Amino acid sequence: MSLLRTVELRKRFGALNACDGVNFTVEKGEFLSLVGSNGAGKTTLVNLITAHLEPDSGRILFEDRDITGLSVSQRIKAGIARSFQLVNLFDGLSVFDNVALAIFARDGKTAKIATLAANDDDVRRETREVLAEFGLAAKGELSAGELAQGERKLLDVAVAYALRPNLLFLDEPTSCVSSAEKAQIMDTVSSVVRSGAVTAVVIEHDMDVVFRYSDRIVMMHEGAFLADGPPDAIRANEAVASILLGISSPA
């Protein structure tokens, strides 16, 4: 049984077929990269799966349960979380409190964060564990707004991970950061996936990152899947090379 499966998923925006009968599977424990040129349909597909868009038709099954009609919050509770291309943090709160707030929300705790943080030892302990996993333990008392861009990206992923999903979608986690920060972010995410804690689907444009970290790569083009396979097979695919890498086969 696949962890996630979509069945003939469709979404149009006027004349644009952004998701054209997509049958997509994600297997438990894999690191999957979703690639394609701008406008290929990658973010639309993830938005459909995470309930930020409604499909025109088709079904979404998670752990063999039909979740097509569930809301964003219901899908989070079911075990699906995501981070966005544009970092979504509370800059006025500390790094620690950003993660703690995600844990409070996950557990349905609604009191003021200052009260909860002062009185909930379990949440404080779990927050420290998440920060340590993401290399942010020493930054806990800083405000999120004080972090460097790469650290902000890491914190954004850590906040999504603190929801303890079974499936985590990451939308361009390495955009607008240095090469060293890219490695730090992806090494951390890869380590969490390899530990068995979560399955990850990453939208990524940096093909060096994609080939280095992925177990499987799926390429979208004009709302449909053009290629699906392990890195070596995708690297050797002439259609992929032509569209993504600008490489044409010899005449």
Where would I find each of the regions flagged by the language model?
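Glycine-rich phosphate-binding loops of nucleotide-dependent enzymes
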Residues: 2-251
